[in-house]
């Protein structure tokens, strides 16, 4: 039975502001009519923004606070004022069971710290991972994790990330046996750090899990679609993600310059417009907005700080989907099966 998709929205987090966050929530509700919301933040500003979205207003409750986590706040600073901030109260709604999940565009480090403290990690997990779906040249997206929550990881962390990432791929993409690979500097077994090689050995020996270990993958193959899940520490993963995002912006800007450089180029753009619009859609990060913290006893998603309303809507829709498909139960069961197999 599907869980009730009620989502707590940190209306004050990120660079986008209350109006964009609520416009995104309203767009998500148009696609997903059963959605309900808890909007957390400055009540006066929230009510003013809701004037433009009567459909959202009818489906929302408001928790007032004027406390905000800034982008400059360290996790330790954010934790000290968690109970008085929009981010902290949104997560607390998940902890109490009032919401099935939370969405914030705020400070990633603070969000991780607050979510871990409030929701706690699943049995056997000491480090949640930040996972996102990214486009590929294949038929499916690829799950990449960790994207910055943990800068240093040992072999056990990486194997747990692999199990959680595979569960996410099955839940979000409907894959029966996702192909899982470890990001490395080469595909040979002797390449990479001790942690990566040890994680590979553990994954090769894992039995009975609904996943396929595909070995190592190099950075130039991330978007080919050869695998469904790519595992790495948060330091490497964040660099890889920012490189992908930067390359997408570079290609988009390059095309814009090329097609506006002369009259002939502008005519060429009109002829090739359907193809260029398809490319722009594929490269637009708003179409893949939303990273989930895996390994927590609850659903918490991070929206890009500069996402537009469409991007926020996609993040909210993903949150609702993960609540309905009970991603928390799926990850918990897979981790338990992995531990049993590892102990056998």
Curated annotation (Swiss-Prot):
GO biological process: fatty acid biosynthetic process; phospholipid biosynthetic process
Recorded catalytic activity of this chain's protein: a fatty acyl-[ACP] + phosphate = an acyl phosphate + holo-[ACP]
Biochemical pathway: Lipid metabolism; phospholipid metabolism
InterPro entries (UniProt xref): FA_synthesis, Phospholipid_synth_PlsX-like
Pfam family, one: FA_synthesis
Main subcellular localisation: cytoplasm
SUPFAM superfamilies: Isocitrate/Isopropylmalate dehydrogenase-like
Enzyme Commission (EC) number: 2.3.1.274
Gene3D superfamilies documented for this protein: Isopropylmalate Dehydrogenase (3.40.718.10)
Keywords: Cytoplasm, Lipid biosynthesis, Lipid metabolism, Phospholipid biosynthesis, Phospholipid metabolism, Transferase
GO cellular component: cytoplasm
Top-level taxon of the source organism: Bacteria
Keyword Transferase found: yes
Gene Ontology terms for molecular function: phosphate:acyl-[acyl carrier protein] acyltransferase activity
Subcellular location: Cytoplasm
Function per UniProt: Catalyzes the reversible formation of acyl-phosphate (acyl-PO(4)) from acyl-[acyl-carrier-protein] (acyl-ACP). This enzyme utilizes acyl-ACP as fatty acyl donor, but not acyl-CoA.
Family classification: Belongs to the PlsX family.
Oligomer and partners: Homodimer. Probably interacts with PlsY.
NCBIfam families associated with the record: plsX
Protein name: Phosphate acyltransferase
Organism: Sphingopyxis alaskensis (strain DSM 13593 / LMG 18877 / RB2256)
């Amino acid at each position: 039975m599907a869980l009730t998709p009620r989502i707590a929205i940190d209306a004050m987090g990120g660079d986008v502001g209350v109006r964009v966050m609520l416009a995104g929530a309203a767009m998500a509700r148009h696609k997903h009519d059963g959605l309900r919301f808890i909007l957390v933040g400055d009540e006066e500003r929230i009510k003013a923004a809701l004037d433009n979205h009567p459909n959202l207003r009818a489906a929302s409750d408001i928790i007032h606070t004027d406390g905000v986590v800034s982008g400059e706040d360290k996790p330790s600073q954010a934790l000290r004022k968690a109970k008085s901030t929009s981010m902290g109260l949104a997560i607390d709604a998940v902890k109490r069971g009032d919401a099935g999940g939370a969405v914030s565009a705020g400070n990633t480090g603070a969000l991780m710290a607050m979510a871990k403290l409030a929701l706690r990690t699943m049995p056997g997990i000491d480090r949640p991972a930040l996972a996102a779906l990214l486009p590929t040249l294949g038929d499916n997206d690829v799950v990449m994790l960790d994207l910055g929550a943990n800068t240093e990881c040992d072999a056990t962390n990486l194997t747990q990330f692999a199990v959680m990432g595979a569960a996410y791929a099955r839940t979000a993409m409907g894959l029966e046996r996702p192909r899982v690979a470890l990001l490395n500097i080469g595909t040979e077994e002797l390449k990479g750090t001790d942690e990566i090689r040890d994680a590979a050995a553990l994954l090769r020996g894992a039995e009975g899990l609904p996943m396929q270990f595909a070995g190592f993958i190099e950075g130039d193959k991330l978007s080919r679609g050869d695998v469904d899940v790519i595992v790495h520490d948060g330091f490497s993963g964040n660099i890889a993600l920012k490189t992908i995002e930067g390359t997408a912006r570079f290609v988009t800007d390059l095309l814009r310059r090329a097609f506006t450089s002369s009259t002939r180029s502008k005519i060429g753009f009109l002829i090739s417009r359907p193809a260029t619009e398809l490319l722009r859609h594929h490269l637009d990060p708003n179409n893949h907005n939303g990273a989930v913290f895996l390994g927590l006893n609850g659903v918490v998603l991070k929206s890009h700080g500069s996402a537009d309303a469409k991007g926020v809507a996609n993040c909210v829709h993903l949150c609702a989907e993960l609540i309905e498909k009970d991603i928390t139960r799926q990850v918990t069961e897979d981790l338990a099966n992995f531990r049993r197999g590892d102990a056998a």
